[in-house]
Curated annotation (Swiss-Prot):
A single cellular component GO annotation: extracellular region
Full protein name: Enolase
EC number: 4.2.1.11
Source taxonomy: Bacteria, Pseudomonadati, Pseudomonadota, Gammaproteobacteria, Vibrionales
Family listed: Belongs to the enolase family.
Keyword Metal-binding included in the entry's annotation: yes
Main location: cytoplasm
PANTHER family: ENOLASE (PTHR11902:SF1)
Native source species: Vibrio vulnificus (strain CMCP6)
Keyword check for DNA repair: no
Length: 433
């Protein structure tokens, strides 16, 4: 009853008004899975390729009809008649058929949408929720946990039209006992942050990921206003709520000059100077996690950063590792960072995503499941976080339905698991157990 009978692709719209790929996989017995590919703004140069049409007369060149054609043509032809329960085989067929290193023939957006839709269809045919099916695929059947959210409540960098260089300032409700309580705490801090910003005359418009995007005097001021909001919500900073940042430093790295140019503050740094700048913020605020603290190619700088901060806080590689096991293996061998951000469209299939999570965990690295800045209502990452017991999730702020869809799915899953998925809070963060 899990044989594929039809594969269908369509062009839908993401949260930035750009087209993306949605796929349906239909099985014998009437079981159907549907999934959509997300899209990033600050992308690593070694990510799998997102195939766009380039026809300026449609969607300013961002159409995905070529990827849809691949789904409805070559991919559908290859998968009809195959067993959807064998996820590894389904993904391998698509990867082999594409035949390129970075999935540039069909597009990672096409392959991923089908990969995830297939997993959903297989779960339906087994009569189980997606997170349970993912746990079985992962070889960890029945082992679940609820992830600690990293909530991006101030957006800067490529995610906002403001003068803040650092891309994300996040809170983690570590004092919560459950995921549902963590969401409530995050919402309370978010609403209090709106009041704090308004009281200072700042704009409260939101960025791509639902966080506020004001023009601020400095990156440190972003942390200061969040600290005020945490206190105003009745929580203790460092005890109930901790802080995290995504620098997305590749976006302000001047490759020719070899310097980090923070235009918002009018400052430039060498790698070593920027590492010490970050270390100063860690001393000043209860920051427990920093993502992409340097440019993706600055491995010598990352080695220094890991020496400087790696035993104190979590250092997450996003553009650095791009959910790629080859690159992650090199990072592990060289002692670079201590955590990986998991974005399945960076690599382009569920099987490869699970392999990256496993490699990280086996090496003592943490794995943080993440959305992209261009999202849809698809909430698969919530099931991925629970089904792999990854421990942490990054899925935006407390506004925009493309973000809260994931939190709402986590609330439903926690309720369904009724105590079988512990919420471990700060223990999940590298260096904080």
């Amino acid at each position: 009853m899990s044989k594929i009978v039809k594969v269908l692709g369509r062009e839908i719209i993401d949260s930035r008004g750009n087209p993306t790929v949605e796929a349906e996989v239909h099985l014998e017995g009437g079981f159907v899975g549907m999934a959509a590919a997300p899209s990033g703004a600050s992308t690593g140069s070694r990510e799998a390729l997102e195939l766009r049409d380039g026809d300026k007369a449609r969607f300013l060149g961002k159409g995905v009809l070529k990827a849809i054609e691949a789904v409805n043509g070559a991919i559908a032809d290859a998968l009809v008649g195959k067993d959807a329960k064998d996820q590894a085989a389904i993904d391998a067929i698509m990867i082999e058929l594409d035949g390129t290193e970075n999935k540039s023939k069909f597009g990672a957006n096409a392959i991923l949408a089908v990969s995830l839709a297939n997993a959903k269809a297989a779960a339906a045919s087994k009569g189980m929720p997606l997170y349970e099916h993912i746990a079985e695929l992962n070889g960890t059947a029945g082992q679940f946990s609820m992830p600690l959210p990293m909530m991006n409540i101030i957006n800067g960098g490529e995610h906002a039209d403001n003068n803040v260089d650092i891309q994300e300032f996040m809170i983690q409700p570590v004092g919560a006992k459950t995921l549902k309580e963590a969401v409530r705490m995050g919402a309370e801090v978010f609403h209090n942050l709106a009041k704090v910003l308004k009281s200072k005359g700042y704009n409260t418009a939101v960025g791509d990921e639902g966080g506020f995007a004001p023009n601020l005097k400095s990156n440190a001021e972003a942390l200061e206003v969040i600290a005020e909001a945490v206190a105003a919500a009745g929580y203790v900073l460092g005890k109930d709520v901790t802080l995290a940042m995504d620098c997305a430093a590749s976006e302000f790295f001047d490759k020719e000059a070899g310097i980090y140019n923070m235009k918002g503050e009018g400052k430039t740094f060498t790698s070593e100077e920027f590492n010490h700048y970050l270390a100063g913020l860690v001393e000043q605020f209860p920051i427990v996690s920093i993502e992409d603290g340097l440019d993706e190619s600055d491995w010598a700088g990352f080695a220094h950063q890991t020496q400087l901060l790696g035993d104190k806080i979590q250092l997450v590689g996003d553009d650095l590792f791009v959910t790629n096991t080859k690159i992650l293996a090199e990072g592990i061998e060289k002692g670079i960072a201590n955590s990986i951000l998991i974005k399945f469209n960076q690599i382009g299939s569920l099987t490869e995503t699970l392999a990256a999570i496993k490699m990280a965990k086996d090496a003592g690295y943490t794995a943080v499941i993440s959305h992209r800045s261009g999202e849809t209502e698809d909430a698969t990452i919530a099931d991925l976080a629970v089904g792999t017991a990854a421990g942490q999730i990054k899925t935006g702020s407390m506004s925009r339905s493309d973000r809260v869809a994931k939190y709402n799915q986590l609330i439903r899953i926690e309720e369904a698991l009724a105590g079988r998925a512990p919420f471990n809070g700060l223990k999940e963060v590298k260096g904080q157990a």
